[in-house]
Each structure stands twice: as C-alpha cells, then as structure tokens.
Amino acid sequence: MGPLQGDGGPALGGADVAPRLSPVRVWPRPQAPKEPALHPMGLSLPKEKGLILCLWSKFCRWFQRRESWAQSRDEQNLLQQKRIWESPLLLAAKDNDVQALNKLLKYEDCKVHQRGAMGETALHIAALYDNLEAAMVLMEAAPELVFEPMTSELYEGQTALHIAVVNQNMNLVRALLARRASVSARATGTAFRRSPCNLIYFGEHPLSFAACVNSEEIVRLLIEHGADIRAQDSLGNTVLHILILQPNKTFACQMYNLLLSYDRHGDHLQPLDLVPNHQGLTPFKLAGVEGNTVMFQHLMQKRKHTQWTYGPLTSTLYDLTEIDSSGDEQSLLELIITTKKREARQILDQTPVKELVSLKWKRYGRPYFCMLGAIYLLYIICFTMCCIYRPLKPRTNNRTSPRDNTLLQQKLLQEAYMTPKDDIRLVGELVTVIGAIIILLVEVPDIFRMGVTRFFGQTILGGPFHVLIITYAFMVLVTMVMRLISASGEVVPMSFALVLGWCNVMYFARGFQMLGPFTIMIQKMIFGDLMRFCWLMAVVILGFASAFYIIFQTEDPEELGHFYDYPMALFSTFELFLTIIDGPANYNVDLPFMYSITYAAFAIIATLLMLNLLIAMMGDTHWRVAHERDELWRAQIVATTVMLERKLPRCLWPRSGICGREYGLGDRWFLRVEDRQDLNRQRIQRYAQAFHTRGSEDLDKDSVEKLELGCPFSPHLSLPMPSVSRSTSRSSANWERLRQGTLRRDLRGIINRGLEDGESWEYQI
C-alpha cells in the first residue's frame, strides 16, 4: 500500500470499475451554470436588458441546449466512477477492502467525510455495494456517518439506511439501527419524486422503501425502532398510498395488510387507510384513480359484510363510503370520470360500482336525462322558429351594385313588436334568452370547480359539447344586444347559434347505448383525424394554388377566370381538392402546357392519395372506439349520472342504498348485492384444477386449501379426486379447455332493493 494520495492522486489499483447502477436509475437534467447570457455572435448582453433582449436570451439558451437526459445520466455515472477511482477511501469502501480502510483511517490527513460526485460518503458506497465489513469499519471510525445524507440534487437526503433497506441487507440495517440511524430521514432528491422520468417511486422514508421492496422483516424492525407509519412525503402520500402505485400488486396487498395491523389509532387519530394526501385522495380513491383493480378488490373485501350464504347465493352489504357521489365532493365516481387514465374506467366494471351506477341510472338518471333532452329539443325548436320569423321589412335604400340582390332588411326595434304575431315571437325570444342565461349559470360554475383543461378537454365529460352550448348561449345574448340597439348584422351570431344549438342535440345521444359511443367517435375524428388531415390539406392547397395562379397569370380572365387572382385561386383549388368542381376547361382556347401536368399531379395526390388516407384514418379510429364502446358508454353514463345528481335538488334525487343507522351499522350507507354462483360450475372448476395440478411436477401444497377456501357455499368439502378410468379416457387438453372456459364466465349479480323501499321485487343487472 502506497502513501495516502489526495483527491487527484492515483487510486488503489486492481479494482474492478464496472459501473454498478445505484438503486434509482433515472437522473435529472443538470442545472445550467449561471453564466452571463451571451449573444449568438459571442457578445455580452447589457445588464439592464429590456423585454426583447430577455426573451431573446431565453430563446438562445433553449435553442443551445445540448445535453439530453440520457447523456446527462451517463455523464454523471461516469463522473461518479471516476471520483471513486480517484479517492482511495471511496475505492476501498466499494471493494470491501477492510485492510486498506484500516490503514487509510490511521492517517490524520484522511478525510473520512469526503464525498463523491453524487454527494455520497464512503458509508453510502459501502451500503450501495452491500459491503457489510467495510460499513462496520467506517461506522466504528466515524459513527456520525450514519446520519450523513447525500447532498446532490439527484439523491438529496438519502442516508445509508435508505440504501441498505432498498437492497434488503438485513445485517447492515440492524447495524445502522443499533447506532441510532434516523428512521425518519427523508430522501427528497429528484430521483425519488413521482415523475415520468423516474422508473420507480418509493416515497421518501426508509419505511416506505422497505414496504415497496416487500421486506416484511425490515418493515417490522423499522416500526419497532420508532418508524412512523403515518409519515407523509412531499406529496402527502403515506406508505399505503405508495403501495397502491407499485407494479407488484400481490406483494402490495400483503404489505398493506401488514401495515394496517400496526395501526393503533386512538380517538383523536384518523385511521391510516383514511388519511388523504395533498390531492385529497385516500389509498382507496387512489387505487380507483390509478385503475388498480387488484388493490381495489382487495380493499373492497375489507369493506364488505357478508350477511348469509344459501347454497350458490351470497348476500353481501358493500360500504359505499368514498364511492357514492352523494354527500362527497370528491367521490370515486367523479374521480374516475375526470382522470385521463384509461385504466381507471375498468373500476366501473367492478362490484359494487357497477351495481351502484346501474341502480342510479335506471331509477333516476335515465328518466331525468330523457326529460332534459325533450326540454332542450323544444327549446331549440322555439329558438329556430324565432329566427325564421324574425322581423324584416322591404328594402328602402337603392342598390349600389348590380350584383346586389337584397330585397328585405332588418326592422328597427320600434317597428319589430307591433302586431300580435310579433308578441308571440317576443314570448319565444324571451324564453330563448332566459334559457341562454340558465345555460351559462349552470356551465360557468363547473368551469371554475373543475378547471378549464379538465372541463373542456375530457371527452367522457362531453368537453366539445360544453364548448358548443356555452358559445351558443353567448351568440344568443349577442343577438339580443344587437336587436336592442338596432344594429345591422344580427344574422351572423344568429346563424352561428342555430348551427351550434342543433349540433348540441347530439349530446343527448349518450343516453342510448347504441348512439352514445358514436358521439365520442365523431369527437375523436374531428379533433384527431380531421385536424391532422387539415394540416396536410393546407400544405397541398397552398402549393398547388400558387402553381395554378402562376400558370394562369398571363391568360385572359374572361376565358379562364378560376385562377385570376390569388384568393380565387385558393378557393378554386380547395373546391378541386374536395372534387366539388371539375378542372377549368374551355375548348375554344388553348390551355397552358404546364396546367395539364400540374393538374394531373394534383388529382393523384388530392383525390387518390389524401382522401383515401383520411378514410383509412377514420376507419382506424372507428375500429379502436368500437372495441371499447361498452366501456366508453359506461363512463358516459357515470358522468351523466354524477352531473344530474349534483344539479338536481335532494328531494328529486334521494340517496341510493341502505342507511346503516337503522340496522346498527353506523352512519354509513350500504348497497346489498346478491351474487349467484353455479354449483355445477364450481365442481367442474375443482375437477379441472385437480387435473391441472395432478400433472404438474411442482405441486403447491397450499393450492388445495386455497381452492377449498375460495368456495363460499361449501367450505367443509374436500377436493374430489377423479377416477383413473376417467382420467385415462379423456384428454388433458380438453379438461384444460373446459377449465379455461368456466373460469372466463362472468358471474351474474342481483340487487335486492326490498330493504330500501319496502318492496319485495328484485332488480337484475
């Protein structure tokens, strides 16, 4: 061993420097150095910059960015390895060279607190590479290293305990806790935030790290040493919230149960599973928003109460807390329809959400929605009749152009309401204006409550239709103002209002399963396929219109006037593109030679290529929407039901379900669901499972117990063993098909609403 070298001295040789990735493998973009802004030509900008110079400097910095995320990550990894090689202490900690560490620590000049490129100490490196012996030597020499966090922006706040926990190094965790390592340290670096740039999200505390890697022993050990199971990270997420976001659903459910077993909440503390994050989401609501059906069903099992089991029938009470939109401003139903995650819509097909939505829609939602549609249809007819019979009078002034063929003009306000017919029209106009005001009073508060982006951008909520109806209401009010001041040109807002008002009738198609998905299909085609097609069409029209204008620029406009001036050339090319008109042909004169070549190319590109491209794009959109039409229609029904429930008074929309107060279940509301399972099908499943597991070499001993426990109507029955003659006479492949077929069949749910309204009839889903 040579003498101790400085930071720039040679490192201990012979060590393997193959890069080992740290626990979190996503690196942030390094901050740009704060240097004086430079002009692109290399000149410094003045200190007191104006608005234009400031914007120009920002544009230059944005344009001159050279480092990508991947490049930045690679550079920091290489820099970290280089720094380790340059430091004998860090290299010895990486290689678990105890002898070298002991020799280095004897020197007075040895800086035991020196840090690497990521702000890590030697103890962090030893924990990262699972070097227990090196970590013990470092902790004996400098016990304060246990409390030292990393200081880089990427891993800020991470201690050696975080690293040991995520690597599941139980011995090192025990050693760190024995030296009073902080169990409440928070790793707040950018690598630990929930971001699309990060591959993992384990929270900030060591306990959440241990829970996410499914280490029950470390979780118990941390809790015994005082780890707070109610600790929240910078997003307000507890360890239960973080478990909801993990990809391994099975382990997450097991760890969820373990953590709840340590929840010893008193009268002044809220239960752990009801603690919301900063967005107001409990773990249950977060599971619904994320579309985590496994965790959602797991949590629903904890909320249900089985009343009785009668053969294949099972009566179950499901707790509607946090699910029902009645009395909850942020219910699960509203969260699902407002989220952008498609997976969240799968929750609408889960029990009891599906049964609750169906009950509300068929009892209250559908009748009220049909009534609202009928009222709107009568309203728009009234507005149309008022527009058709608007006050007009013969034209009084003289014509100023031979092309002017106007015969009638708008009456003044004093002349518009003089006859009995005008009084009838006035009533219709008042109804129209009052209706427009009501529309604005209903729509505008929702914009502020939900936000502009969510309100207008969500297709399920009817975003484009909200734009139509609000614009229609404004056009009606503009028409009213122009009528009051006797301004000419009221036909412009009136025409827009008629088109928008009648187009909004399509919104009420969502009440029908056959027509509802088609409204979404139209929206996707208009704002998706058609918008992209319009950009291509604009490029083609601009190019060919310019060419046609140049070709006919020297010709007589009286003979070939389609492309005489440039605006006319653009409009004529647009008509040619849509095949509204044919190409200009006058056989009495000679056409330019380049016209034939240009028109042939235009016909091939526009008619044969681009129009068929649009048809293909729309066909693909139709295919995608058709495959999820049931899911989309169910989401539309939920959105419509929640909207009507919030708008209508409680006397017109009573709360659905059973109040638990009358039955000793507290103030919560429940929904009773009867599940029916075919007894023969259950037996076939057990036989098929027996054949499937009998031929397997690695038979799980617990599978028989799980199969028996999974049968709710006969838990005491043992697994039937098939006879040898039957097993030899039937192919195992047929049994496998039978097993798969039976498992794919969905159960039928029945809701008995007799406890709600005193009736004895059943409501079948």
From Swiss-Prot:
<feature type="transmembrane region" description="Helical">
    <location>
        <begin position="426"/>
        <end position="448"/>
    </location>
</feature>
<dbReference type="InterPro" id="IPR005821">
    <property type="entry name" value="Ion_trans_dom"/>
</dbReference>
<keyword id="KW-0325">Glycoprotein</keyword>
<keyword id="KW-0112">Calmodulin-binding</keyword>
<keyword id="KW-0472">Membrane</keyword>
<feature type="repeat" description="ANK 3">
    <location>
        <begin position="156"/>
        <end position="185"/>
    </location>
</feature>
<keyword id="KW-0677">Repeat</keyword>
<dbReference type="GO" id="GO:0017158">
    <property type="term" value="P:regulation of calcium ion-dependent exocytosis"/>
</dbReference>
<keyword id="KW-0109">Calcium transport</keyword>
<feature type="region of interest" description="Interaction with calmodulin">
    <location>
        <begin position="133"/>
        <end position="143"/>
    </location>
</feature>
<dbReference type="InterPro" id="IPR024862">
    <property type="entry name" value="TRPV"/>
</dbReference>
<keyword id="KW-0106">Calcium</keyword>
<dbReference type="GO" id="GO:0055074">
    <property type="term" value="P:calcium ion homeostasis"/>
</dbReference>
<dbReference type="Pfam" id="PF00520">
    <property type="entry name" value="Ion_trans"/>
</dbReference>
<keyword id="KW-0107">Calcium channel</keyword>
<feature type="topological domain" description="Cytoplasmic">
    <location>
        <begin position="449"/>
        <end position="463"/>
    </location>
</feature>
<comment type="similarity">
    <text>Belongs to the transient receptor (TC 1.A.4) family. TrpV subfamily. TRPV6 sub-subfamily.</text>
</comment>
<keyword id="KW-0040">ANK repeat</keyword>
<keyword id="KW-0479">Metal-binding</keyword>
<dbReference type="GO" id="GO:0005516">
    <property type="term" value="F:calmodulin binding"/>
</dbReference>
<dbReference type="GO" id="GO:0046872">
    <property type="term" value="F:metal ion binding"/>
</dbReference>
<keyword id="KW-0407">Ion channel</keyword>
<dbReference type="InterPro" id="IPR008345">
    <property type="entry name" value="TrpV6"/>
</dbReference>
<feature type="modified residue" description="Phosphotyrosine; by SRC">
    <location>
        <position position="201"/>
    </location>
</feature>
<feature type="topological domain" description="Extracellular">
    <location>
        <begin position="553"/>
        <end position="565"/>
    </location>
</feature>
<keyword id="KW-0597">Phosphoprotein</keyword>
<comment type="subunit">
    <text>Homotetramer. Probably also forms heterotetramers with TRPV5. Interacts with TRPV5. Interacts with S100A10 and probably with the ANAX2-S100A10 heterotetramer. The interaction with S100A10 is required for the trafficking to the plasma membrane. Interacts with BSPRY. Interacts with TCAF1 and TCAF2 isoform 2. Interacts with calmodulin.</text>
</comment>
<keyword id="KW-0813">Transport</keyword>
<feature type="region of interest" description="Interaction with S100A10">
    <location>
        <begin position="638"/>
        <end position="642"/>
    </location>
</feature>
<feature type="topological domain" description="Extracellular">
    <location>
        <begin position="389"/>
        <end position="425"/>
    </location>
</feature>
<feature type="topological domain" description="Cytoplasmic">
    <location>
        <begin position="1"/>
        <end position="367"/>
    </location>
</feature>
<feature type="glycosylation site" description="N-linked (GlcNAc...) asparagine">
    <location>
        <position position="398"/>
    </location>
</feature>
<dbReference type="GO" id="GO:0070588">
    <property type="term" value="P:calcium ion transmembrane transport"/>
</dbReference>
<feature type="transmembrane region" description="Helical">
    <location>
        <begin position="530"/>
        <end position="552"/>
    </location>
</feature>
<dbReference type="GO" id="GO:0005262">
    <property type="term" value="F:calcium channel activity"/>
</dbReference>
<dbReference type="GO" id="GO:0006816">
    <property type="term" value="P:calcium ion transport"/>
</dbReference>
<keyword id="KW-0406">Ion transport</keyword>
<feature type="repeat" description="ANK 6">
    <location>
        <begin position="279"/>
        <end position="308"/>
    </location>
</feature>
<dbReference type="GO" id="GO:0035898">
    <property type="term" value="P:parathyroid hormone secretion"/>
</dbReference>
<feature type="intramembrane region" description="Pore-forming">
    <location>
        <begin position="566"/>
        <end position="585"/>
    </location>
</feature>
<keyword id="KW-0812">Transmembrane</keyword>
<feature type="topological domain" description="Extracellular">
    <location>
        <begin position="484"/>
        <end position="489"/>
    </location>
</feature>
